[in-house]
Structure formats: structure tokens, C-alpha cells
């Protein structure tokens, strides 16, 4: 009997933070594939308003969430940016296990993988009005409720690392401090 080749998908995002929309996308991808590689993009950035969390913190957010969901068929790979788009796919390939299909809604990522002959699929965004990293970070800074927008393990990690205090402090200017 011939064995079936495992079908492995690739998804990349900054996950600043990992939210319920990301979780739904992971579940949808896994409904069509045997496993998923989740690339933690812009892994070298942290401690800014746009990228407040480290790659390690994002790794914790994702792995704890997937464990709670009883999802075990995944790989988490931090991927630093390469400031040469023509080299980026090779960079990703060097860091990850082989994959068959790429899921992205990012036009540049789509183009780069298509040029390398990958099958690229998009997924519908889930509750995009509320579940975006930008919107969630804005809520954190403003002191608005954000906890319902992310899975419970993400809330726990953010509290463990004092993430709310961090992002609020990062959102201030030196003029705010001297007043």
C-alpha cells in the first residue's frame, strides 16, 4: 500500500498579539492540511508600540493557546525580516521544515511565494473589525477591554510579562515623562 505524503501548510504573521482571528485561521488551515508551520514574523522586533512583544513571548502565546485547544500538529518558527524581498522566501525555506502550501492575505508575501511556484491560498478574515493586532494594541493603550479579543492563554502571558504596562509606557513620549 502506498503511503500518503503529509500535507504541510505555512502561515506567517507578526501575532502582536495572537488573537482569536489567528486561532480561527489556524483551525481552518488544519482542516485542510495535516500540519502547519506558523512563522513568527519580524522576530527581531520587540518593545515598540507596533511590535511590543518578543518572539519568545509570542511563541508562548501561540503554543499555550494551541495546547489548550488540543492542537499539537504544528511547528513554531521565529523568522526575522530580511530587507531583500528577492531573498525572503529562501530565508523562510532555510528556517522551516518543508511545506506544500502557503496561506496569506498579504499581497507581497503572496507574490513572493507564487514566483517560487508555491500554491498560495487566502483565507477570509474573521471578525476583522475587532480582531486585528492594531485594534487590540490600541485598546490596551487606551485602557479599554481587550481580553475578549484574544484567547485566555494570551491574556495570561500578557499579564505574566506585564505587557499592558509595557505597551502603555512605549506609547508615551519623552515629553509625557517630564510633565
UniProtKB/Swiss-Prot annotation:
Native organism: Thermoplasma acidophilum (strain ATCC 25905 / DSM 1728 / JCM 9062 / NBRC 15155 / AMRC-C165)
Primary enzyme class: transferase
Source organism superkingdom: Archaea
Pfam families linked: CTP_transf_like (PF01467)
Protein name as it appears in the record: Nicotinamide-nucleotide adenylyltransferase
Cellular compartments annotated: Cytoplasm
Keyword line: ATP-binding, Cytoplasm, NAD, Nucleotide-binding, Nucleotidyltransferase, Pyridine nucleotide biosynthesis, Transferase
Main localisation: cytoplasm
Alphabetical GO biological process terms: NAD biosynthetic process
Family stated for the protein in its record: Belongs to the archaeal NMN adenylyltransferase family.
Pathway(s) per entry: Cofactor biosynthesis; NAD(+) biosynthesis; NAD(+) from nicotinamide D-ribonucleotide: step 1/1
Enzyme Commission number(s): 2.7.7.1
One GO CC term, this protein: cytoplasm
GO molecular function: ATP binding; nicotinamide-nucleotide adenylyltransferase activity
Keyword Transport: no
Coiled coil: none
Catalytic activity from the UniProt record: beta-nicotinamide D-ribonucleotide + ATP + H(+) = diphosphate + NAD(+)
SUPFAM superfamilies listed in its UniProt record: Nucleotidylyl transferase (SSF52374)
Amino acid at each position: 500500500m502506498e503511503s500518503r505524503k503529509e500535507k504541510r501548510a505555512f502561515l506567517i504573521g507578526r501575532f502582536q498579539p495572537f488573537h482569536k482571528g489567528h486561532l480561527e485561521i489556524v483551525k481552518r488551515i488544519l482542516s485542510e492540511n495535516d500540519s502547519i508551520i506558523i512563522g513568527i514574523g519580524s522576530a527581531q522586533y520587540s518593545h515598540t508600540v507596533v511590535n511590543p512583544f518578543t518572539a519568545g513571548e509570542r511563541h508562548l502565546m501561540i503554543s499555550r493557546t494551541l495546547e489548550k485547544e488540543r492542537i499539537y500538529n504544528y511547528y513554531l518558527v521565529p523568522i526575522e525580516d530580511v530587507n531583500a524581498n528577492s531573498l525572503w522566501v529562501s530565508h523562510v525555506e532555510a528556517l522551516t521544515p518543508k511545506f506544500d502550501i502557503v496561506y496569506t492575505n498579504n499581497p507581497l508575501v503572496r507574490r513572493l511565494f507564487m514566483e517560487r511556484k508555491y500554491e498560495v491560498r487566502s483565507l477570509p478574515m474573521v471578525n476583522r473589525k475587532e480582531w486585528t493586532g492594531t485594534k487590540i494594541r490600541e485598546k490596551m493603550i487606551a485602557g479599554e477591554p481587550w481580553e475578549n479579543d484574544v484567547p485566555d492563554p494570551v491574556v495570561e502571558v500578557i499579564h505574566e510579562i506585564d505587557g499592558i504596562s509595557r505597551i502603555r509606557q512605549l506609547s508615551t513620549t519623552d515629553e509625557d515623562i517630564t510633565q
